[in-house]
From Swiss-Prot:
<dbReference type="InterPro" id="IPR011009">
    <property type="entry name" value="Kinase-like_dom_sf"/>
</dbReference>
<dbReference type="InterPro" id="IPR017441">
    <property type="entry name" value="Protein_kinase_ATP_BS"/>
</dbReference>
<dbReference type="GO" id="GO:0032968">
    <property type="term" value="P:positive regulation of transcription elongation by RNA polymerase II"/>
</dbReference>
<comment type="similarity">
    <text>Belongs to the protein kinase superfamily. CMGC Ser/Thr protein kinase family. CDC2/CDKX subfamily.</text>
</comment>
<keyword id="KW-0808">Transferase</keyword>
<keyword id="KW-0067">ATP-binding</keyword>
<feature type="region of interest" description="Disordered">
    <location>
        <begin position="345"/>
        <end position="376"/>
    </location>
</feature>
<feature type="binding site">
    <location>
        <begin position="25"/>
        <end position="33"/>
    </location>
    <ligand>
        <name>ATP</name>
    </ligand>
</feature>
<protein>
    <recommendedName>
        <fullName>Cyclin-dependent kinase 9-B</fullName>
        <ecNumber>2.7.11.22</ecNumber>
        <ecNumber>2.7.11.23</ecNumber>
    </recommendedName>
</protein>
<dbReference type="GO" id="GO:0005524">
    <property type="term" value="F:ATP binding"/>
</dbReference>
<feature type="domain" description="Protein kinase">
    <location>
        <begin position="19"/>
        <end position="319"/>
    </location>
</feature>
<dbReference type="GO" id="GO:0106310">
    <property type="term" value="F:protein serine kinase activity"/>
</dbReference>
<keyword id="KW-0539">Nucleus</keyword>
<dbReference type="GO" id="GO:0045944">
    <property type="term" value="P:positive regulation of transcription by RNA polymerase II"/>
</dbReference>
<dbReference type="Pfam" id="PF00069">
    <property type="entry name" value="Pkinase"/>
</dbReference>
<dbReference type="InterPro" id="IPR050108">
    <property type="entry name" value="CDK"/>
</dbReference>
<dbReference type="GO" id="GO:0005634">
    <property type="term" value="C:nucleus"/>
</dbReference>
Amino acid sequence: MVKNYDSVEFPYCDEVSKYERLAKIGQGTFGEVFKAKHRQTGKKVALKKVLMENEKEGFPITALREIKILQLLKHENVVHLIEICRNKISPTANQYNRCKGTIFLVFDFCEHDLAGLLSNAHVKFTVAEIKKVMQMLLNGLYYIHRNKILHRDMKAANVLITRDGVLKLADFGLARAFSLAKNSQPNKYTNRVVTLWYRPPELLLGERDYGPPIDLWGAGCIMAEMWTRSPIMQGNTEQHQLTLISQLCGSITPEVWPNVDKYELYQKLELPKGQKRKVKERLKAYVKDVCALDLIDKLLILDPAQRTDSDEALNHDFFWSDPMPSDLKNMLSTHNQSMFEYLAPPRRRGGHMPQQPANQARNPAATNQSEFDRVF
């Protein structure tokens, strides 16, 4: 779908000086993200910098891909690209240098990201509010997948939420169009995508012909995180991440994942054997809702062919049983400050369970660190 990058629509770019930068709210390999406001209207926006210095052949293809995808996607639960701006160009710049400098993607401003909210102990989600978060997240995934787009970087920091409680999938810097394999020729997408803690087992094993299930695995990790308040599998390496996945989701074998032994890495890596699936058992100390546990379990299925998709997930009993999904606006209205992962203290990592919610008794079985490596 997103093939012809010549059709990217930005024949004229305004200068970014029309916006006043207010604060830095994000940092990554791509550059920086700033909160800003339009100098004339006062409208708040987010400015995402696209670094150009190292591009010897014009505009970076990854940025072109992101822009094209963002222009294609128009949905309430997907971040909205307003325009593209640039730094002021010198009057003496030649045609080559006019393509250099810094480009900014301008987005509608969202007050929070989910990682920032979960980092704040004063932010407490009810089950009904968690249902609303996941319903919006899955609606966004359903829409992008229906439009043949993979996000490829699902994580809590890339889930934005406005002050009015509207969720937006964000950061399409790794996104790409996908298609079914043609003429028995498998796709050869890169598997070096998705932040390690949210990366599904098929990518860790080297799969290059993948599809929407990679994003649903990330959705499952995020859903569990709504209760645990920190990423549930925090590996240090790809091998370690596969070990943690095996300890939570059971040993990776052809019995539970047909043809998994086709992967060269499956033969090379020493993965844990004899591990039983413990998703529900390990999470029940945090997640008291039976339907929620069942949906998380279905999203974290090892075999991508058996993993639930966004349509099935949205029809799950979790969303259609009491309490019904509830608006986030009232809860968020009690918090005046924006919350972003970049501005929050480092989230708990490695060696310890995340803090147990005050109203939940800790399950001794779930804290026996002698039996398993770091998972939650």
